[in-house]
Curated annotation (Swiss-Prot):
It comes from Tolumonas auensis (strain DSM 9187 / NBRC 110442 / TA 4). The lineage of its organism: Bacteria, Pseudomonadati, Pseudomonadota, Gammaproteobacteria, Aeromonadales. It holds the Pfam family GAD. InterPro entries: Aa-tRNA-synt_II, aa-tRNA-synth_II, aa-tRNA-synth_II/BPL/LPL, Asp-tRNA-ligase_1, Asp-tRNA-ligase_1_N, Asp/Asn-tRNA-synth_IIb, AspRS_core, GAD-like_sf. SUPFAM superfamilies: Class II aaRS and biotin synthetases, GAD domain-like, Nucleic acid-binding proteins. Its EC number is 6.1.1.12. ATP binds at residues 217-219, 226, 481, 533-536. Homodimer. This is Aspartate--tRNA ligase. It is found in: Cytoplasm.
Length: 588
């Protein structure tokens, strides 16, 4: 039906006859002539209708926005005064001599020239996707997956599918359950990741596996989370952590170069402990110049219990955060930041404005200055590299509260004060704790229970699980965790030790992971892998801060599809076939 896409018409086609198919993006009737901007997935081109072609001109008078049409015409060069440098096709236009209205459009529920609510956009997603911005995002996503497939193929990876209907296993979030009609009373689970299957593929000898795969987690949603999401899933045999990181870093560096022409350079490596100490986060945004500085050793003997208590507590922390030029903040603004950190459990927010740094105690203004002497103040100013006109905020509480509260404050201040550098800052975060306390006297795996410990024997792990570090690694770009992985456990005794450490009994091990423990008995190779979030990578590469902008048909933050009205009630016959009774009834 067409000879060329709208967005591909250039000055090289001048005087050629072309046929275009697409939609009316905009229509302008200038009396003697009718102009339309005609759009398809590749872009927009200007078409004009002249009364000299009376049949086409008469039909063009009926055109309205979003009519689906076919146009035949001659490519003309625009006069110099009419060249539109903002359009890829801005040097040309189409003089139409043929027009076919393929389908008319009713008045639109969306206005493409205004900002529509997200609810409107999701309800009429098929119209929202016609917007050039949305088409560009999904085309970028397609380019990303195409690049990934080429890279993986060139490096010897096999694209192997794993099951969608599988067994529920404890991986952190809730599973989406699928009832079985054949095995009444039993349920499949949709996979949170292909974790165990990709490990089994390594045990089967496939050596290098990848898959671009849907995963499902029934968890509370945020702006960058969806109940169904897409992973670039990777697993390798006989490679150590450093080799996996090198392979995957080169993939991401190549991706950034290919998609947006940016050289990310070599990724720095930072330990989890250093990231938490300096930034209060295991996914630090290095574009933000502010860092947390520990000062507990200076405050153990002060008379101010808010500082002295955590300073003397092995599980406590006192940290300072210097804000460049922050002394300009008003008391009202400081109170707002104090309210903000309370969300993260902080009981208050002490502060110190630096008027004259070289004057020590005499050169600062602070409600807590009366509890500090000149030597302490000078050391705080020195450690934080404070300058005249700065403000220093203090966090004093448990290590977790200080990291959470001051880490979040660091991000908010950088946004509010425009301190974030406009660049790309990737890194690897490594050496995560193997376990963390669960608040009930036990421990839980920080990543997942199939991650191998770093330089720990089963006996050492059993004796002191909280002392173990995981052989795990996360890739972080501009404060987003874009991928994470680890070396996996490949010995049965270590796997059972980890299961016991997190409170999984022998009986439960056999019930839920018997197939894995059996497989580990038959010459399992050392293996390691990683998974990237495709949605999040696309979000970064397209410059949006909303993951729903890079998914064709996303869910709302309430995990609903406004367009299809999913989820919906099942009818009684369906429920009966599945031997299911529900306590919630559909509205009559």
């Amino acid at each position: 039906m067409r000879s060329i896409y709208c967005g591909q018409v250039t000055s090289s086609h001048v005087e050629q006859t072309v046929t275009l198919c697409g939609w009316v993006h905009r229509r302008r009737d200038l009396g003697g002539l009718i102009f339309i901007d005609m759009r398809d997935r590749e872009g927009i081109v200007q078409v004009f209708f002249d009364p000299d072609k009376p049949e086409a001109f008469a039909l063009a008078s009926e055109l309205r926005n979003e009519f689906c049409i076919r146009v035949t015409g001659v490519v003309r060069a625009r006069p110099d005064s009419q060249i539109n440098k903002d359009m890829a096709t801005g040097e040309v236009e189409i003089f139409a001599h043929g027009l076919e209205i393929i389908n008319r459009a009713e008045p639109l529920p969306l206005d493409f020239n205004q900002t529509n609510t997200e609810e409107q956009r999701l309800k009429y997603r098929y119209l929202d996707l016609r917007r050039p911005e949305m088409a560009a995002s999904l085309k970028t996503r397609a380019r990303i997956t195409s690049f990934v497939r080429r890279y993986m193929d060139e490096h010897g990876f096999l694209d192997i599918e794993t099951p969608m209907l599988t067994k529920a296993t404890p991986e952190g979030a809730r599973d989406y359950l699928v009832p079985s009609r054949v095995h009444k009373g039993k349920f499949y689970a949709l996979p949170q990741s292909p974790q165990l299957f990709k490990q089994l593929l390594m045990m089967s000898g496939f050596d290098r596996y990848y898959q671009i795969v849907k995963c499902f987690r029934d968890e509370d949603l945020r702006a960058d989370r969806q109940p169904e999401f897409t992973q670039i899933d990777v697993e390798t045999s006989f490679l150590n952590a450093e080799q996996v990181r090198e392979l995957m870093e080169n993939l991401i560096r190549g991706l950034w170069q290919n998609i947006i022409g940016v050289d990310l350079g070599q990724f720095p490596i930072m330990t989890f402990d250093e990231a938490m100490r300096r930034y209060g986060s295991d996914k630090p945004d290095l574009r933000n110049p502010m860092e947390m500085v520990d000062i507990a050793d200076l405050l153990k003997d002060v008379s101010f219990a808010v500082f002295a208590g955590p300073a003397n507590d092995p599980k406590g922390r006192v940290a300072a955060l210097r804000v460049p030029d922050g002394a300009q903040l008003s008391r009202k603004q400081i109170d707002e930041y104090t309210q903000f950190v309370s969300i993260y459990g902080a009981k208050g927010l002490a502060w110190m404005k630096v008027n004259q740094a070289d004057s020590g105690l005499a050169g600062v203004q602070s409600p807590v200055a009366k509890f500090l002497n000149d030597e302490i103040v000078r050391e705080i100013l020195s450690r934080t590299s404070a300058q005249d006109g700065d403000i220093i905020f203090f966090g004093a509480d448990s290590k977790k509260v200080v990291c959470d509260a001051i880490g979040a404050l660091r991000l908010k201040l950088a946004r509010d004060l425009d301190l974030v550098e406009n660049c790309w800052k990737p890194l690897w975060v490594v050496d995560f704790p193997m376990f963390e306390e669960d608040g009930e006297g036990g421990v839980t795996a920080m990543h997942h229970p199939f991650t191998a410990p770093k330089d720990f024997t089963p006996a050492q792990l059993e004796a002191d699980p909280l002392a173990a570090y995981a052989n795990a690694y996360d890739m972080v770009i501009n404060g987003y965790e874009v991928g994470g992985g680890s070396v996996r456990i490949h010995r049965g005794d270590m796997q059972q030790t980890v299961f016991r450490a997190i409170g999984i009994s022998e009986a439960e091990q056999k019930e839920k992971f018997g197939f894995l423990l059996d497989a580990l008995k038959f010459g399992t190779p050392p293996h390691a892998g990683l998974a990237f979030g495709l949605d999040r990578l696309t979000m970064l590469l397209t410059g949006t801060d909303n993951i729903r902008d890079v998914i064709a048909f996303p869910k709302t933050t309430a995990a609903a599809c406004l367009m299809t009205d999913a989820p919906s009630f099942a009818n009684q016959q369906q429920l009966s076939e599945l031997a299911i009774q529900t306590t919630v009834k559909a509205a009559e």
